[in-house]
C-alpha cells in the first residue's frame, strides 16, 4: 500500500493489516 505520510503509524498499521490479510 502507499501512505502519504510514512510516519503515520495508523496508516502503516492498516497497510500491513491489508498485506497480512
UniProtKB/Swiss-Prot annotation:
Where in the chain is the site Endothelin-receptor binding site?
21
**What biological processes does GO assign it?**
regulation of vasoconstriction; vasoconstriction
GO molecular-function terms, A-Z: toxin activity
List the cysteine pairs that form cystine.
1-15, 3-11
Q: Which UniProt keywords apply?
A: Cardiotoxin, Disulfide bond, G-protein coupled receptor impairing toxin, Secreted, Toxin, Vasoactive, Vasoconstrictor
> What tissues harbor this protein?
Expressed by the venom gland.
GO CC annotations on file:
extracellular region
**Subcellular location, record wording:** Secreted
Q: What does this protein do?
A: Vasoconstrictor activity. These toxins cause cardiac arrest probably as a result of coronary vasospasm. May act by displaying agonistic activities towards endothelin-1 and -2 receptors (EDNRA and EDNRB).
Which family, according to UniProt? Answer: Belongs to the endothelin/sarafotoxin family.
Return the protein name. Answer: Sarafotoxin-D
Query: What is the species listed in this Swiss-Prot or TrEMBL entry?
Result: Atractaspis engaddensis
